[in-house]
């Protein structure tokens, strides 16, 4: 039987991906890049959930990740539609420019 990768490696990978996503959310000014960073954080949480489910031998974690991925696909569709609508109205996706109220 091949040696299995320890759960701590998966959790470390998940932590690194989550940190990269968090840095992206905090430093980027373009709405699309912020959106992609949030998706990276969501996928990092999915990796952690699957790692815990694998270590406990439970399939419910994988089922939960499948549901989360389905909801994330809907989030992507809605989020990109909102970003496109904002771009059509304002000609920019820079969040600093979008924070200003129209007068």
Swiss-Prot record:
Membrane-spanning intervals of the chain: 5-25, 32-52, 66-86
Record keywords? Cell membrane, Membrane, NAD, Quinone, Translocase, Transmembrane, Transmembrane helix, Transport
UniProt keyword NAD, yes or no: yes
Coiled-coil residues are none
Q: How does the record classify its membrane topology?
A: Multi-pass membrane protein
| A GO biological process held by the record | ATP synthesis coupled electron transport
GO molecular-function annotation terms?
Answer: NADH:ubiquinone reductase (non-electrogenic) activity; quinone binding
Enumerate the catalysed reactions.
a quinone + NADH + 5 H(+)(in) = a quinol + NAD(+) + 4 H(+)(out)
- Listed GO cellular component terms? NADH dehydrogenase complex; plasma membrane
Places the protein is found: Cell membrane
Q: What is its EC number?
A: 7.1.1.-
Q: Signal peptide span per the entry?
A: none
Protein family (similarity comment): Belongs to the complex I subunit 4L family.
Summarizing the function annotation, the protein's role is: NDH-1 shuttles electrons from NADH, via FMN and iron-sulfur (Fe-S) centers, to quinones in the respiratory chain. The immediate electron acceptor for the enzyme in this species is believed to be a menaquinone. Couples the redox reaction to proton translocation (for every two electrons transferred, four hydrogen ions are translocated across the cytoplasmic membrane), and thus conserves the redox energy in a proton gradient.
Do you know which NCBIfam families this protein is assigned to? PRK05715.1-2 (NF004320), PRK05715.1-3 (NF004321), PRK05715.1-5 (NF004323)
Q: How does it assemble?
A: NDH-1 is composed of 15 different subunits. Subunits NuoA, H, J, K, L, M, N constitute the membrane sector of the complex.
Q: What is this protein called?
A: NADH-quinone oxidoreductase subunit K
Q: Which gene encodes it?
A: nuoK
């Amino acid at each position: 039987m091949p040696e299995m990768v320890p759960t701590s490696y998966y959790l470390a990978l998940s932590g690194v991906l989550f940190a990269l996503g968090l840095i992206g959310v905090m430093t980027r000014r373009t709405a699309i890049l912020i959106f992609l960073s949030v998706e990276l954080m969501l996928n990092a949480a999915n990796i952690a959930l699957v790692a815990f489910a694998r270590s406990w031998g439970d399939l419910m974690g994988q089922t939960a990740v499948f549901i989360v991925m389905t909801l994330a696909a809907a989030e992507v569709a809605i989020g990109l539609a909102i970003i496109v609508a904002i771009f059509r109205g304002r000609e920019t996706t820079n969040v600093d420019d979008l924070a200003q109220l129209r007068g």
